[in-house]
Each structure stands twice: as structure tokens, then as C-alpha cells.
């Protein structure tokens, strides 16, 4: 059976998929969404591990529609997974989004036909759906990163990944637990499980740089008392800042400020909680290595004072940083270091010598054996393109996305790809995923997407494809910004980009400049795209 009476197919029911379906449907387009989980929520439906919560500044982690707040009140400054799922249920009630989604089904392939100028999406059960426009909204947190460690299948205890936490997971209370990874999910699970585990061993690839989650109690109370109009104004202002959170960096270079004044400013930003120290610090934090080290040294002094164990102190907060401060998104914490300083918690550095083996009851590393009853992988996800690659997409002439990106990701505006007409991916590689509030990025992308599709319909455009030249131009624009920062000092490389000696660059110019690029494309006659009109294709 093939579902054919569609204008657009959306894959994924997280923030981007929900908003795309809602906005396109409002414009009168016939839209069908597919989601592998049983309900709306995206990563929040899947990430059910203990301690899972939002770490973004309040009130910016929500849909930018204050009307949703007429009968909704946030109960937490940093909403837990449970509250986020209630929020998605509320959105569904107001927008009736589930009516346009089929749940519990995965997409196994997607292919473009030059004959029909339509996409055919194949589902895992063999059914198909066809539409003019194909919109993968799978983000970059959909394919798990699980290290291949010999002996995993022999382990007699429980093995979990934070992004695939089962509803029937055993309690960690009184257990000997191993946590592999100290990224955002690792930081959250260490704080929750560390309080109840009999013993916890943390396997650390690199030290996590963290910031205080909360500022003053008054700050929390004020945030939760915001009215719908207050939210509307905050969200409006957020879209006018580079990071989408309303944070504005101090318009001075670090070393131009006397040291006493500098430290006083650092203290204010540090105590403000959230990402104020990172996003509202001096403007050259991520451009100047000396300025960056100055900020790190202040943070390290404050943080090292919280750790009594000398060995742990050097592992967790080394005097010389492993990488520049802020080029990896800082995690937010409440009592992380106090928990890791406890005698029942052990930290093992695996930066130079990886885990050797998992046995029936233990993990072997550095010639020692760590007995455990549960292993938690807090190892995150694949690279930013892994979600798109997992859909097995084929474009013009049957070209596979994996082959088109064999030497690394290439795109136009971080949304479109040459040889893949009428396909726009949302919140994926080469858009502002690193430094900007995700709902803000998604908001401007979906606004632009709706304008593009509407313009094509009005103009009689049946095929719209990014040019190969636009890839080069976007790469050049990204590089001009990227090379001025410290991000290149710790750039991630996938296996493919490492072989090609290419960095996995992304857009680090922030939201305002990115939005301007999208607007310029529209204003300049769909710059970077080639269009085919109905009359032209009829002659082919």
C-alpha cells in the first residue's frame, strides 16, 4: 500500500518535526509525519535515564508560541523529563499534532524520483508514502554511540545506554555501578545514581567542564512567576541575540580589563548560574587562547576548592586544561564534585588507555579489575550526520547520501544538499547546533522552510535543488567564522573526515547571522538553488 495524496513527509516528532508539521499544516499543505516512538517528544521520549532534565536557560526551551502558555505553567526552572513529556502532551492537545503522525514505525529508506519529482519513503513494515517534499527532522541525537568493547555480551549484569533507558530498568540502589562517559547525560546520571549506589566507578575520557545550574533562589522564583506576556517578550528578545538565550557577551576583550575588575566580573557571571559565565562573559572567550585560559583558571580555582581528594582533583579539574573552555558545551551541575569526591566513587582515566575487556562480572582496564553489577554507557550519539545517514536516503540518479558525504558533510545553509531535490533537513549538521538554543534555531529554520515551500507552490516550481557551488560557498562562510575561533583546536573528526583530513565544521556565527543568511536566500531569488518549473519538466 502506498500513501500518495501528500505534499510533505516529515520524519521525527521532536521539536523540529512537530513544528514543521504544525506550520505546514496551517498553510494548507497535506503533511504526514512518521515517528519511531509511541508518542511525541523526540529525545525526551527516549532519554529516560535517572536525572534527565533540561539544562537550557529558562524560559527559552519551549516552542516560541506564547499562546501555548494560556493554560500551561512551568513548574521547574530546569524541567525534568517528566515535565517535558507533559508539555508535549499539552502541545498535542492544543495543536492536535498526533493526528498528522503515525507512531511506532521507523523509516527504512527514502528515494527521490526524477520522473515524478516526488519522494518515496519506505517504512520498516514495507508500506510506502509519496510526497513532493521530504523533511527529515531527526536531529543529531538519534543514533546511539556505543563503544565496541570485547566481552560485552558475556556480562551477567545490566547494561544500559542513557538514550535507550528501559522502563523496567533495575534500581541502582545498593548496586556497584560503572558509568562510562562524562558528557551531559553522564553528569546528570552521576549526580542521581551516585547518591544511591553502593559503589560507582566513572570511566573518564576527558574532564567535563561544568557550571552552576542555579543562581539565586530569587532568580528561580521570578522565572516561574512569569506570565504569558513575559514569556512572549523573552522569546522575542531571545531571537534577537546570537545565542538565542538572551545572553549578551561583555563588549570588551578579557585582557583589556584590569585583573581585579576581571575577577569580580567572573564572580558575578559564575554565581548567576546557567551558562552566564560561558555565554555572557568577555567577547573573546572563544577567540583568544590567553583570554580563554584566564577564564578557565578562575573556574578551576573555584571548582578545585570543592574537591578534597588530591588525585581526583587533578583528574577532574587539571591545572592545565585538556581543551579550551567553552568549545564543548559546559554541563550544568548542582553537587557533581561533592558526589565524585565521596569515598565510594572511583574515577579512572581512559584518555590514553581504553577499556580492555568486559567479563561476566567486571570491567578490566589499566591492568586492574573493577567489579560491577550494572554498566551505564553515557557515551552520547554518533556524529551530527548519523541520524540522516540512518534513513538510507537516495537522491537524483539514485545517489546515496553516504556516498555524497563520503568525504564529509556538505550542504547549503545546513538544510539542503546538492543532488537531493525537494529535501530539507532540520537541526542537523552545519547549522548553529553548537552555540545556540535549539528551539530558536528550529523556529527560524521552519519559518524559512515554510516560506520556501509556499514560494515554490506559488511560482510553479516542482523541483528545488541546492547547487554544488552553494556547498563551496557555505563551506567558505563557515570556515571564515570557524577559523577565527578556538573550535578548530578541538574539532571532532568522524572516520570519513579523518581519512580526508577534514574537520567537522559547523556554523559558529550564531543565530542572527544565520537567520540573515536564510533571509538573503529568499530575498535574492532563492540564491544557491536551482529551480525547475512545471512547464519545463513537462517537456523533458
Curated annotation (Swiss-Prot):
Organism: Epichloe uncinata (Endophyte fungus)
Enzyme class: oxidoreductase
Binding residue positions for NADP(+): 53-55, 182-188, 205-206
UniProt-annotated site: Transition state stabilizer, residues: 329
Induction of its expression: Expression is induced in loline alkaloid-producing cultures as well as in planta.
Function statement: FAD-binding monooxygenase; part of the gene cluster that mediates the biosynthesis of loline alkaloids, potent insecticidal agents composed of a pyrrolizidine ring system and an uncommon ether bridge linking carbons 2 and 7. Lolines are structurally differentiated by the various modifications of the L-amino group and include norloline, loline, N-methylloline, N-acetylloline, N-acetylnorloline, and N-formylloline.
Cofactor note text: Binds 1 FAD per subunit.
InterPro entries documented for this protein: FAD-binding_Monooxygenases, FAD/NAD-bd_sf, Flavin_mOase-like
Family, similarity comment: Belongs to the FAD-binding monooxygenase family.
Protein name stated in the entry: FAD-binding monooxygenase lolF2
GO BP terms: alkaloid metabolic process
